[in-house]
Amino acid sequence: MAAQIKKYITSDELKNHDKPGDLWISIQGKAYDVSDWVKDHPGGSFPLKSLAGQEVTDAFVAFHPASTWKNLDKFFTGYYLKDYSVSEVSKDYRKLVFEFSKMGLYDKKGHIMFATLCFIAMLFAMSVYGVLFCEGVLVHLFSGCLMGFLWIQSGWIGHDAGHYMVVSDSRLNKFMGIFAANCLSGISIGWWKWNHNAHHIACNSLEYDPDLQYIPFLVVSSKFFGSLTSHFYEKRLTFDSLSRFFVSYQHWTFYPIMCAARLNMYVQSLIMLLTKRNVSYRAHELLGCLVFSIWYPLLVSCLPNWGERIMFVIASLSVTGMQQVQFSLNHFSSSVYVGKPKGNNWFEKQTDGTLDISCPPWMDWFHGGLQFQIEHHLFPKMPRCNLRKISPYVIELCKKHNLPYNYASFSKANEMTLRTLRNTALQARDITKPLPKNLVWEALHTHG
């Protein structure tokens, strides 16, 4: 029997397959049709839609275990990429993935989850004890702060469970994600994964990364003044007079907004779970959110008066707002771009759009892995306890290829973020017409 003749497709021809119902990707030079798979893709539809029509080997390697490769054959179109090539950066990146796998750095680290759960149990017990068995206002305030710390730590577990297997059993891993996010925090793990996977794929794309799309309250670039389109939310991000007013003073309102940011996450979670959007384990997630909506208000109701109840809730939200600040520090002051994420410069875009936070090892528990955000973006399935180990390898690779490896102290990162917000705020004040008088009496009397 004669050998089968290979069929080829060029990169330009591949680009034409980037529309709903016609989604092709290339992995190691082989073209795959994922049009029908998009609705069942565990990582959601957005990554496939965003990278369709491109060579995406590096992104595939970053997000999928080795066991996934055997599933690709059923999507193979029979076409090979005629002009397929691998950059030196990608070659070295893939070598690192292979070496780290050989070193066992991707292996499950259940002890980290267990230690975090023990810490969460302690925080929960202390907060509940302070509410139920103590009478002082300051104790109740402290109990609210402890609840905020609990939400931060449960967020790290949800983050870990959403990225990789924190335990050996897949069903238990899903339960851990729902328990940490939905039951303890009231946040849908399904919504978080949908949002967070998009952020990883389109790191710092103003049109595709939802973690930069906070109009009307915050913008990190004057490019938003042109009313860009969010391909994540599938709507126009209109920069109107109200947006301009808020943005003009965003460097003053940044921290208060971060303290209240969790309220938006509650709303987004409910929208996700109560609409027709495809959600795995919808019933389990709704049950988890119901559990939270019972125990937290019940605990708050045990406080002696409405003043202390409001104080407790504000303290909880404000403390967990530190986590929202941490998310922002990693990207707000970094390089941004307009347009689709590219599959052929995966390593470069992840390093260019990300900032590490330098901290001593004994503070790793506080940052939950975000202090090594560059490493996390490049190797998202790696347990966070190993990110410090691989940092020297990443630094060396960045130096070899003259790529940025940006890092700053926690205080410096805050300063950089506020500077970015202030620069954009000042630009917003200057464009075209003055701010509407009925919105900005205070603005007319405020400077800086």
UniProtKB/Swiss-Prot annotation:
UniProt-annotated location(s): Endoplasmic reticulum membrane
GO annotation, cellular component aspect: endoplasmic reticulum membrane
BP-aspect Gene Ontology terms: unsaturated fatty acid biosynthetic process
EC number, as in UniProt: 1.14.19.47
Transmembrane stretches, start-end: 112-132, 137-157, 172-192, 212-232, 254-274, 286-306
CDD domains listed in its UniProt record: Delta6-FADS-like (cd03506)
Domain Cytochrome b5 heme-binding as annotated: residue spans: 6-90
Motif (Histidine box-3): 373-377
Binding locations of heme: 41, 64
Pfam families given in the database record: Cyt-b5, FA_desaturase
Pathway as given in its UniProt record: Lipid metabolism; polyunsaturated fatty acid biosynthesis
Family annotation (SMART domains): Cyt-b5
Swiss-Prot/TrEMBL catalytic activity: (9Z,12Z,15Z)-octadecatrienoyl-containing glycerolipid + 2 Fe(II)-[cytochrome b5] + O2 + 2 H(+) = (6Z,9Z,12Z,15Z)-octadecatetraenoyl-containing glycerolipid + 2 Fe(III)-[cytochrome b5] + 2 H2O; a (9Z,12Z)-octadecadienoyl-containing glycerolipid + 2 Fe(II)-[cytochrome b5] + O2 + 2 H(+) = (6Z,9Z,12Z)-octadecatrienoyl-containing glycerolipid + 2 Fe(III)-[cytochrome b5] + 2 H2O
Keywords from the named record: Endoplasmic reticulum, Fatty acid biosynthesis, Fatty acid metabolism, Heme, Iron, Lipid biosynthesis, Lipid metabolism, Membrane, Metal-binding, Oxidoreductase, Transmembrane, Transmembrane helix
The protein's role, per its UniProt record: Fatty acid desaturase able to introduce a delta(6)-double bond into delta(9)-unsaturated fatty-acid substrates. Can use both linoleic acid (18:2(9Z,12Z)) and alpha-linolenic acid (18:3(9Z,12Z,15Z)) as substrates.
Domain statement: The histidine box domains may contain the active site and/or be involved in metal ion binding.
Protein name as annotated: Acyl-lipid (9-3)-desaturase
